[in-house]
Amino acid sequence: MSTSPLSPVASSRADAALVLFSGGQDSSVCLAWALERYARVETVGFDYGQRHHIEMEARVAVRHQVAERFPHWARRLGEDHVLDLTGFGAVAHSALTADVAIEMTERGLPSTFVPGRNLVFLIYAAALADRRGLGALVGGMCETDFSGYPDCRRDTLDAMQSALNLGMDRDFVIETPLMKLTKAQTWALAKSLGGEDLVDLIVVESHTCYQGERGDLHPWGHGCGECPACELRRRGYEEWDAAGREALGA
């Protein structure tokens, strides 16, 4: 966790947000989205023993570049927090936490599904937000171009929002700006938020690949090019590029 003091705050502020920030494409776009809308934005990352642990380095690079390239956002960008959830990773069996093949399971879900991951992340994020006085929890969950993960559905997150607010006597809002967007539209949203400069930042600095590959830089970013995460990212980028690289809503 960050070494900055985590002073208790009396009430959560509606103009302050906590972004669940992995350092991937989706959470990087969500960070930019939050910085456009909130007066103060903090970030939280989770170390749960993921095979693609390199994303923890990518998130530092993305934050640094956002502050460097977008001074108006830098003034709003607050503390970064990293929470150790390796105990959870040891319990939740998945291709992202163990050396097993990436394939479909008997449940009809990809082996990359980490049972309960987003639910656990949101509980910890809410506890941190409560202490830091942050009223919005922003996540990159999406139910269009996604891998069938049940904890990425909006009805799951609505239920989680209700549970958090009942259990903590707060009024948190879980914001999911990518929920109804395709991956191509996510690239378009990035351009609408920060132009080609933000698109370039996400291509070069963010990390999506489940295999943790950071070797070759493809037009859509770093990655093995074969895992489901790379395939979604590549296909979305190519679709957006072929359509003229327009900003969302243009």
Swiss-Prot record:
The keyword Nucleotide-binding applies. Its EC number is 6.3.4.20. ATP binds at residues 21-31. Keywords: ATP-binding, Ligase, Metal-binding, Nucleotide-binding, Queuosine biosynthesis, Zinc. Coiled coil: none annotated. Binds 1 zinc ion per subunit. PANTHER family: 7-CYANO-7-DEAZAGUANINE SYNTHASE. Belongs to the QueC family. Catalyzes the ATP-dependent conversion of 7-carboxy-7-deazaguanine (CDG) to 7-cyano-7-deazaguanine (preQ(0)). This is 7-cyano-7-deazaguanine synthase. It comes from Caulobacter sp. (strain K31). The lineage of its organism: Bacteria, Pseudomonadati, Pseudomonadota, Alphaproteobacteria, Caulobacterales. The gene is queC.
